[in-house]
Amino acid sequence: MSGFIEIQHDEWVAATPDIVRAYYNDLSHREVARVHPRERLRQLAPGPTGPRFERLARAGWRTTRDVVERHERADGSVLDQFVVGAHWGRSIVARFYRSSDGARTGTLVELTLTQPLRPFVGRLLGRWQRRRLEAELREFAVDIKVDVERGYRTARRLRAA
């Protein structure tokens, strides 16, 4: 097994697509509200294609550091590409679709994670890595859903005293 792992996860959120997209793009809120408890974000100088940020993630006893470039596409989707660090080559695409769940309207968030496999490691640990990535993506989507439905407002900004 070598090549790529591609995982897709859909999550329904009880908010409009504009609010969910604004939430996903608001890195300062993700850092201040500690949406993902094992994650720290720090914005860097913009790269050649758009905003860049550093992501420190704690996994067990070790911390990984990644530099991520964000691309906002014309169709409204957002592409995060990991350009430096332990997860180099990984990309996450977030798409936001208007959806209705019975009597309620909301947003269907479609997350697609693509991870390259190293040739030797892919054969040995490919299935284990796929299960781990699926669990991480599900946890990430649920954290987004809970925080948005808790009452995210796009006007909130961090202010220095």
Please report, for each region that a protein language model flagged, where it lies by residue:
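Hydrophobic ligand-binding cavity/cleft-lining segments
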Residues: 1-49
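Solvent-exposed residues in well-ordered beta-strands and their adjoining turns
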Residues: 12-16, 97-99, 112-118, 147
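Short acidic, gly/pro-rich beta-turn/loop elements at beta-sheet edges
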Residues: 19-21, 32, 63-65, 91-92, ...
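Hydrophobic pocket/interface hotspot
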Residues: 20-24, 30, 53-55, 70, ...
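Short, surface-exposed, polar/charged, turn-prone segments marking secondary-structure boundaries
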Residues: 35-41, 48-51, 70, 81-83, ...
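Hydrophobic-ligand binding "helix-grip"
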Residues: 37, 58-108, 114-116
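Short, well-structured hydrophobic secondary-structure segments
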Residues: 50-60
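A conserved amphipathic terminal alpha-helix motif
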Residues: 116-161
